[in-house]
Every structure is written in C-alpha cells, then in structure tokens.
C-alpha cells in the first residue's frame, strides 16, 4: 500500500516538472509566461526559445507521461492500473505544484502515456496527428482533432478488432479523460481557429486559410 501511495505521488510530481518554464528561466533568462501565448508548453517554447529548447521541452514532457505509466513496473506495484499513474502525470503537467498550478496543454505528456500503455494505438494517433498537422498547419487543430479521433477510435476499434482487439473500459475512460483535458486546455485556440486567426507552423497546406497576422 505504501509503495502504491509513493508511486502515485511520484507520478504527479513527475508530471509537475515545468520543463519549458525552467528551460527558459535557467538557460535563456526568460519567463515564457511573459512571451507569445504565455503558455509553458512545447509550441510556445519553440516559438520563443527556438528549436533546441522546443525539442528538449517536447521530449521531456513526452517522457514524463511514459515514465509515469511505467512506474508500477519499476516499483513493483500491483492492483493499480498503469493508466492511473499516467493520468496523474498529465494532471501534474496541467496543474504543476512547482509552477503555481499553471501548466501546459497536456498534449505531449498524454501522448507519452498512450505510448507507455498501448504503443500500437500511439503510432496510429501519431499518423493521424501528422496528417492533420500537414493539412491544417496548426498544432492546436491537430491536437484537438486527434483527441476527438482518439475517443472515437477507443470506442469503435474493438468492434472490428483493429489495433484494440477487445474492449478495455478503463483504457477507454482514461482516453476520454485525456482527450477532454486536451480539448478544454485548447479553448482559446479553438476560438482563434473559428476567427481564422490561429498561429501557424511554417509548412503545410493551411486548408482553413488562417491569417494570424490579422490579429496584430
């Protein structure tokens, strides 16, 4: 029991590491909350601090989710699903104790959780994400639509035995929870997409014809 409690606390604390914020403060003497979107996640880190910092932020945030999901194996914990540990890491990332409970949008960490529990489902979602990203040129749109598709896929794939051979109710509930967190954390982005003013990446088709310059 004590091992389980320690593991759950560690999962939350692991998720609470504010990677982008600390990289900005330590290596660039910048507080990401004062630049760009004010978010401390991967996208704003790329935009404000550059490719190296953005890549490091993504990698660490991603691995937080995977490592937390694998904690039960490392600590020999039984009786609690690895997905619980992964969810706690995502909650920690979103509401980090080390950063005033103001965290990121949970995309990278959620992806890490999925990899840690279902690698095949992760690969499928990466293909979906990359396809939407190319078509729309927006990380936010790719994140939100991938979250919606993840829910639908978790519900429908077991019916045909594709990727998910049988229903796992708890896995489905966790996927729904992670997806809802991602969607809710992107509510401002969704509004900008509706207004055609969302920020773009420098490649892709931009099929929705966003014009972020119009908001300046």
Swiss-Prot record:
Please provide the record's keywords in A-Z order: Cell membrane, Lipid biosynthesis, Lipid metabolism, Membrane, Phospholipid biosynthesis, Phospholipid metabolism, Transferase, Transmembrane, Transmembrane helix
Q: Which GO terms describe its biological process?
A: phospholipid biosynthetic process
Principal localisation: membrane
EC number(s) on record?
A: 2.3.1.275
Q: What SMART domains does the record point to? A: G3P_acyltransf
Domain of life of the organism encoding this protein:
Bacteria
Please name every pair of cysteines joined by a disulfide bond in this record: none
Q: In which pathway does it act?
A: Lipid metabolism; phospholipid metabolism
Q: Per the record, GO CC terms?
A: plasma membrane
Locations listed in the record: Cell membrane
InterPro entries with a match to the protein in the record? G3P_acylTferase_PlsY
A GO molecular function annotation here is: acyl-phosphate glycerol-3-phosphate acyltransferase activity
Matching entries from Pfam families are given as: G3P_acyltransf (PF02660)
Residues annotated as transmembrane: 4-24, 71-91, 113-133, 144-164, 165-185
Q: What is catalysed by this protein?
A: an acyl phosphate + sn-glycerol 3-phosphate = a 1-acyl-sn-glycero-3-phosphate + phosphate
| Subunit structure and binding partners | Probably interacts with PlsX.
* Family named by the database record: Belongs to the PlsY family.
**Functional description taken from the UniProt entry:** Catalyzes the transfer of an acyl group from acyl-phosphate (acyl-PO(4)) to glycerol-3-phosphate (G3P) to form lysophosphatidic acid (LPA). This enzyme utilizes acyl-phosphate as fatty acyl donor, but not acyl-CoA or acyl-ACP.
UniProt protein name: Glycerol-3-phosphate acyltransferase
Q: Organism source for this protein?
A: Streptococcus sanguinis (strain SK36)
């Amino acid at each position: 029991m004590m091992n389980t409690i320690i593991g759950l606390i560690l999962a939350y604390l692991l998720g609470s590491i504010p990677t982008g914020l600390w990289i900005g403060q330590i290596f660039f003497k910048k507080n990401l909350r004062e630049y760009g979107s004010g978010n401390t996640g991967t996208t704003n880190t790329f935009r404000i601090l550059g490719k190296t910092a953005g890549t490091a932020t993504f990698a660490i945030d991603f691995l937080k989710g995977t490592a937390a999901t694998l904690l039960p194996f490392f600590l020999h914990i039984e009786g609690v699903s690895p997905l619980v540990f992964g969810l706690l890491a995502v909650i920690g990332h979103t509401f980090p104790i080390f950063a005033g409970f103001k965290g990121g949008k949970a995309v990278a960490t959620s992806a890490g959780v999925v990899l840690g529990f279902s690698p095949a489902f992760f690969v499928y979602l990466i293909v979906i994400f990359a396809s939407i990203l190319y078509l729309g040129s927006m990380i936010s749109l790719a994140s939100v639509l991938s979250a919606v598709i993840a829910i639908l896929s978790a519900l429908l794939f077991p019916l045909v035995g594709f990727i998910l051979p049988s229903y796992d109710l708890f896995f489905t509930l966790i996927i729904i929870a992670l997806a809802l967190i991602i969607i809710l954390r992107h509510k401002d982005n969704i509004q900008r997409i509706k207004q055609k003013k969302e920020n773009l990446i420098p490649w892709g088709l931009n099929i929705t014809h966003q014009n972020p310059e119009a908001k300046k």
